[in-house]
From Swiss-Prot:
Keywords: Coiled coil, Disulfide bond, Fusion of virus membrane with host endosomal membrane, Fusion of virus membrane with host membrane, Glycoprotein, Host cell membrane, Host membrane, Host-virus interaction, Lipoprotein, Membrane, Palmitate, Signal, Transmembrane, Transmembrane helix, Viral attachment to host cell, Viral envelope protein, Viral penetration into host cytoplasm, Virion, Virulence, Virus entry into host cell. Residues 885-906 are annotated as: Fusion peptide 1. Residues 1317-1350 are cytoplasmic. This is Spike glycoprotein. Residues 904-926 are annotated as: Fusion peptide 2. It is found in: Virion membrane; Host endoplasmic reticulum-Golgi intermediate compartment membrane; Host cell membrane. The lineage of its organism: Viruses, Riboviria, Orthornavirae, Pisuviricota, Pisoniviricetes.
Length: 1350
């Protein structure tokens, strides 16, 4: 059990010598020379066994001092090694041995004593990592043996010197830590190491290296030599003036352990894992050494084990890891020990765990920090003018304090350091600025007040003093940053000192008849006393009085002053008050600097640089731009007081943009433990230093990334992601813009990879399914409807916002971030709250899409199942019997007239016989009147004309009896006039329909435009809400919250450390309050959007995919169909329905019961029972059923009622219940309205692309909504709609002579064609009976004269 316990006990040994201040380190070594050594660094360095720091195994972690934790995970900032650090490997070896007897005469070591390392924050040591295993002996690489643990030895100091050969040695006091007693003792002493002069010693000849050694066979046997290594060290150095010597016992074992050394103002601290957690790795402080001088360097002392040749052993390497100020995530077990840890600055995955203070992170996309480009240079522009002339301060007689002199400088360069170096400064105090900042800033003016003043009275001039100096002589103004310098003037400065110091001790005005009323006249800050105008330049005696009588114009009275004289000192003593005023312009006062090439901006365009422009400092990117603003004003600012443009001295206008700073997200898959990094909304070409990204969380650069091949996507630059053109329908890692990260273990079995793959989300359109009846209940039942279209916008998500808390509050300034630590886990809670809101968004959107997504789509006619007649929606089929052919239209005259409704019957009757004889027989009846069409064809004209003429001609021959032949003509005229009258009546009725129907249409249009206005207004509010919130948050950055400036850079540049903390703390408080309000608003909006997303899902499923029975849920009135399209941050619905326009009031009951015992009751289904509209109740009252959405009484049947239990609200009936009849259909046919609506409607599903990029541009739909409002106004002034009369087309057949002429013409045409084709041409015979003889004449022959060619 002893080996399992912490046995490192404090056995501090203090040995006092002759001097009480020092301890006695005797005996000194009596060796005349130092042991010989062979330094073979190559042999030690070629053996490499890497042991990187693994925080998961608690490597190198020093337990927090003075506190403990149990069963908790937290972030802790302190001194830790870097995760993955390989450290420096050191190895000890055995010595040379001649034989098996005697001591080896030569040590075999590496060159460790020649290497000096920076101590910085300290280091930790891994000891015995390979103990108990088999390894190589360095001196004999071919021999393997069991490895033993070896403790390291160190020298630590603050100053160095060299030997004559140029080898480093420690000077002055040094802390030496030496293991001894064969691993059972640890010595620590603080002495001056004086090199010994013997042979092979540091100050002697043939010096090679110093080291320590033990002789195994003699020092490590039954009696352990506790000082063997110490004595060997004394052979190289004499230990002089040692202030302490401590020793600690160690249990000898081969257990691996950790050892650490740190330093602070309390001294040097030693830490060990043996004290409290021997096998766990937690290091606890076990000693604090009184070493207060800052340690700068350390050296590993070589160590050699002298052994016999046949008993050599291998010694485990130890590893030294530097400590850094880091943030670690620590996991404390129930017993209080650290069992897991993560270096928050190691990589993006580590940062993810630390951002959410958890070792277990679920699969998702997380916002963790921000990437900010580092400055690559400096650009300075300031007046290139002469040096400010301070010579008046250095010549002449120094003025008295009441007659101080003032110098105001502008348009010059000052050297305040050079000025103050001329004086012996006794006090330098500032207000609103630091002494260092006032000497290196640019100002619009610099003012210096100077005067002779004894340093013995400097307390009277300090702020808050109420003595005579601030009352009557000089009062420092604090309106602007100011510094006060009290100094004495050396003899080599030419300024002349006055005979004595003097000041005004009294300045009053005497008034009254006897001048007995005295009024003190005090001065204002920075102003002269009124008594100064008539006071002497110096007072000849102490208490000297001086007066001046005021004129009547000045108000009368007497001014009286008293002067006090102070003896002059040996050297003139003076006071200087320096005040500066901030501003910008070409006449600024700037320090004299060696600018080098910082004046050139041309080679820095497009790069992130630190700039100082006439006193305006910052960091940004300069680009050539089109000039804006007033050139004389030089600087162009935005509404948040940020510099956006600058007119340079080279004549160009440069835009100033912030350096790249973008949010960084980590894509993490828990099942594979893989991650990728997303730089939001930035091109990869702008992220030039991504491999050394600065982490606001850890205040350091992230040191590792697994991939250096970034992939450009629509959402930003991603590393750790490859693009294989995948398409998925389900995504657990949405990136936005319809992009998804797919882990290596994907849904595709044939696919595997070692990193994430980029995929595109593919959503299908929702389908239209069978509609169901609408439902509702109202006392007034609709009897007529109008067609309405309602538009509705539902916000389903808000833009994801991630605010880097530290970046927002501190803008990257380390001083601010250190103060922010005092606010605890506030920033972590902010990040967690925003991430929670973003996860809530992802969950609600994913749930929404999952609920509304369908796997297939159908056309309209297949999607609308049931008793729907969709023939009206189809293209009419040409060729039916109801259509005339094209030949008939060509051969007959066609006349189309208005048809009041009887033309078709008349036409069918006329086809049954001769039309001229059946005209009167085919007369039609309309409302009791016989009617005929108002048209005659030629046959009927001939018949009626012949009848009329015959009756007239024969009237004289037949004594009027032939007049009866005119009766058919008269009847024909009467019936046709009746037809004209009936047509006029129908036209009159249609005029009424025109007014009524179009008025209804206009009402629906007005309602539609009104809902469009409301919907657009909601879209505008939803889109602008995020931009307005971000603008408000950004505007708070310009709020000073009571500090001297809203810029931390200005505060750091102007104030000292104490004042910086107070001013920055005000900004932190204010900005955290603003950020907290913003986060609270985001959480509320996120929850509201999530609830709205559920509502949108319900509406898609109930309104778009089916017909809703809820009145008013899917638009106004009775729902018919709805459509949805994508809109910013939500869905835009178009609901189509019927809105009642007329109602009838009926007497209704909730149910009906008889008087049986128990009573038998029935209740209506989707309607209610109504009476027969009688005015009184009686036994014979008849009850009917009507639907609640349309008034149409019908008998009570099994289809419209059901049996229920009795209820007091049901109507009691005296008679028996009517027996239910068979089902009676009461469907209402809306095919006309459906035809008009579906005629030009195209429905498709929305593109469910996630909107991830924050848009701070405000959406303004006011103009569009104003236009819609004007349309509504104009619709109120115009009404028209037409109901078209039925058309009748009449074909009039041609008479016989027209047909005869038509046939003759055709015969003539055919003969002409025949003779042209068959009876023309030479030798042609027509039908073999005609022959052409001389129809082809031959041509005459001519003699042709021959032509001879010579």
């Amino acid at each position: 059990m002893t080996r399992l316990m912490c046995l490192l006990m404090s056995l501090s040994i203090f040995v006092r010598g002759f001097d009480s201040q020092f301890v006695d380190m005797s005996p000194a070594s009596n060796a005349s020379e130092c042991l010989e050594s062979q330094v073979d660094a190559a042999a030690f360095s070629k053996l490499v066994w890497p042991y990187p720091i693994d925080p998961a195994k608690v490597d190198g972690i020093i337990y927090p001092l003075g506190r403990t934790y149990s069963n908790i995970t937290l972030e802790y900032t302190g001194l830790f090694p870097l995760q993955g650090d390989l450290g420096m490997q050191y190895l000890y070896s055995v010595s040379h041995a001649v034989g098996n007897d005697g001591d080896p005469t030569k040590a075999y070591i590496s060159n460790y004593s020649l290497l000096v390392n920076d101590f910085d924050n300290g280091f930790v040591v891994r000891i015995g990592a390979a103990a108990n295993s088999t390894g190589t002996i360095v001196i004999s690489p071919s021999v393997n043996t069991k490895i033993k643990k070896a403790y390291p030895a160190f020298i630590l100091g603050s100053s160095l010197t060299n030997t004559s050969a140029g080898k480093p040695l420690y000077a002055n006091y040094s802390l030496t830590i030496i293991p001894d007693g064969c691993g059972t003792v640890l010595h620590a002493f603080y002495c001056i190491l004086k090199p010994r002069t013997g042979n092979r010693c540091p100050s002697g000849s043939d010096y090679n290296a110093y080291f320590i050694y033990e002789t195994i066979h003699s020092d490590c046997q039954s009696t352990i030599n506790r000082n063997a290594s110490l004595n060997s060290f004394k052979s190289f150095f004499d230990l002089v003036n040692c202030t302490f010597f401590n020793s600690w016992d160690i249990t000898a074992d081969e257990t691996k352990e950790w050892f650490g050394i740190t330093q602070d103002t309390q001294g040097v601290h030693l830490h060990s894992s043996r004290k409290g957690d021997l096998y766990g790795g937690n290091m606890f402080r076990f000693a604090t050494l009184p070493v207060y001088e800052g340690i700068k360097y350390y050296t590993v002392i070589p160590r050699s084990f002298r052994s016999k040749a046949n008993k050599r052993e291998a010694w485990a390497a130890f590893y030294v890891y530097k400590l850094h100020q880091l943030t670690y995530l620590l996991d404390f077990s129930v017993d209080g020990y650290i069992r897991r840890a993560i270096d928050c600055g190691h990589d993006d995955l580590s940062q993810l765990h630390c951002s959410y203070t958890s070792f277990e992170v679920d699969t998702g996309v997380y916002s963790v920090s921000s990437y900010e480009a580092s400055a690559t240079g400096t650009f300075i522009e300031q007046p290139n003018v002469t040096e400010c002339d301070f010579s008046p301060m250095l010549t002449g007689v120094a003025p008295q304090v009441y007659n101080f002199k003032r110098l105001v400088f502008s348009n010059c360069n000052y050297n305040l350091t050079k000025l103050l170096s001329l004086f012996a400064v006794d006090e330098f105090s500032c207000n609103g600025i630091s002494p260092d900042a006032i000497a290196r800033g640019c100002y619009s003016t610099l003012t210096v007040d100077y005067f002779a003043y004894p340093l013995s009275m400097k307390s009277y001039i300090r702020p808050g003093s109420a003595g005579n100096i601030p009352l009557y002589n000089y009062k420092q103004s604090f309106a602007n940053p100011t510094c006060r310098v009290m100094a004495s003037v050396p003899d080599n400065v030419t300024i002349t000192k006055p005979g004595a110091y003097g000041y005004i001790s009294k300045c009053s005005r005497l008034t009254g008849v006897n001048q007995d009323i005295e009024t003190p006249l005090y001065i204002n800050p920075g102003e002269y006393s009124i008594c100064r105008d008539f006071a002497p330049l110096g007072f000849s005696e102490d208490g000297q009085v001086f007066k001046r009588t005021l004129t009547q114009f000045e108000g009368g009275g007497l001014l009286i002053g008293v002067g006090t004289r102070v003896p002059m000192t040996a050297n003139l003593e003076m006071g200087f008050v320096i005040s500066v005023q901030y501003g910008t312009g070409t006449d600024s006062v700037c320090p004299m600097l060696d600018l080098g090439d910082s004046l050139t901006i041309t080679n820095r365009l497009g790069k992130c640089v630190d700039y100082s422009l006439y006193g305006v400092t910052g960091r940004g990117v300069f680009q050539n731009c089109t000039a804006v603003g007033v050139k004389q004003q030089r600087f162009v600012y935005d509404s948040f007081d940020n510099l956006v443009g600058y007119y340079s001295d080279d004549g160009n206008y440069y835009c100033v943009r912030p350096c790249v700073s973008v949010p960084v997200s980590v894509i993490y898959d828990k099942s594979t433990n893989l991650h990728a990094t997303l730089f939001g909304s930035v091109a990869c070409e702008h992220v030039t230093t991504m491999m050394s990204q600065f982490s606001r969380l850890t205040q350091s650069n992230l040191r590792r990334r697994d991939s250096n091949t970034p992939l450009q996507t629509a959402v930003g630059c991603v590393i750790g992601l490859s693009n294989n053109s995948l398409v998925v329908s389900d995504c657990k890692l949405p990136l936005g813009q319809s992009l998804c990260a797919v882990p290596p273990v994907s849904m595709f079995r044939s696919y595997s990879a070692s990193q994430f793959q980029l995929a595109v989300l593919n959503y299908t359109s929702p389908i239209v399914v069978t509609p169901i009846n609408s439902s509702g209940f109202t006392a007034a039942i609709p009897t007529n409807f109008s067609f309405s279209l309602t538009q509705e916008y539902i916000e389903t998500s808000i833009q994801k916002v991630t605010v880097d808390c530290k970046q927002y509050v501190c803008n990257g300034f380390t001083r601010c971030e250190k103060l922010l630590v005092e606010y605890g886990q506030f920033c972590s809670k902010i990040n967690q709250a925003l991430h929670g809101a973003n996860l809530r968004q992802d969950e609600s959107v994913y749930s929404l899409y999952s609920n509304i997504k369908t796997t297939s789509t159908q056309t309209l006619e297949y999607g609308l199942n049931g008793d729907f007649n969709l023939t009206l929606l189809q293209v009419p089929q040409i060729g039916g019997s109801s259509y005339r052919s094209a030949i008939e239209d060509l051969l007959f005259d066609k006349v189309t007239i208005a048809d009041p409704g009887y033309m078709q019957g008349y036409d069918d009757c006329m086809k049954q016989g001769p039309q001229s004889a059946r005209d009167l027989i085919c007369a039609q009846y309309v409302s009791g009147y016989k009617v005929l069409p108002p048209l005659y064809d030629p046959n009927m004209e001939a018949a009626y004309t012949s009848s009329l003429l015959g009756s007239i001609a024969g009237a004289g021959w037949t004594a009027g009896l032939s007049s009866f032949a005119a009766i058919p003509f008269a009847q024909s005229m009467f019936y046709r006039l009746n037809g004209v009258g009936i047509t006029q009546q129908v036209l009159s009725e249609n005029q009424k329909l025109i007014a009524n129907k179009f008025n209804q249409a206009l009402g629906a249009m007005q309602t539609g435009f009104t809902t469009s206005n409301l919907a657009f207004s909601k879209v505008q509010d939803a889109v602008n809400a995020n931009a307005q919130a971000l603008s408000k948050l950004a505007s708070e950055l310009s709020n000073t919250f009571g500090a001297i400036s809203s810029s931390i850079s200005d505060i750091l540049a102007r104030l000292d450390t104490v004042e910086q903390d107070a001013q920055i703390d005000r900004l932190i408080n204010g900005r955290l309050t603003s950020l907290n309000a913003f986060v609270s608003q985001q959480l509320v909006r996120s929850e509201t959007a999530a609830r709205s997303a559920q509502l949108a899902s319900d509406k898609v499923n109930e309104c778009v995919k089916s017909q809703s029975k809820r009145n008013g849920f899917c638009g106004s009135g009775t729902h018919i169909v709805s459509f949805v399209v994508n809109a910013p941050n939500g869905f835009y619905f178009f609901h189509v329905g019927y809105v009642p326009t007329n109602y009838t009031n009926v007497t209704a009951a909730y149910g009906l019961c008889n008087h049986n015992n128990p009573p038998l009751c029935i209740a209506p289904i989707d309607g209610y029972f109504i009476t027969n509209q009688t005015t009184t109740y009686s036994v014979d009252t008849e009850w009917y059923y009507t639907g609640s959405s349309f008034f149409k009484p019908e008998p009570i049947t099994q289809a419209n009622s059901r049996y229920v239990s009795s209820d007091v609200k049901f109507e009691k009936l005296e008679n028996n219940l009517p027996p239910p009849l068979l089902e009676n259909s009461t469907d209402v046919d809306f095919k006309d309205e459906l035809e008009e609506f579906f005629k030009n409607v195209t429905s498709h599903g929305p593109n469910f692309a996630e909107i991830s990029k924050i848009n701070t541009t405000l959406l303004d739909l006011s103009d569009e909504m104003a236009i819609l409002q004007e349309v509504v106004k104009q619709l109120n002034d115009s009404y028209i709609d037409l109901k078209e009369l039925g058309n009748y087309t009449y074909y009039n057949k041609w008479p016989w002579y027209i047909w005869l002429g038509f046939i003759a013409g055709l015969v003539a045409l055919l003969l002409c064609v025949f003779f042209l084709l068959c009876c023309t041409g030479c030798g042609t015979s027509c039908l073999g009976k005609m022959k052409c003889k001389n129809c082809c004449d031959s041509y005459e022959e001519y003699d042709v004269e021959k032509i001879h060619v010579h």
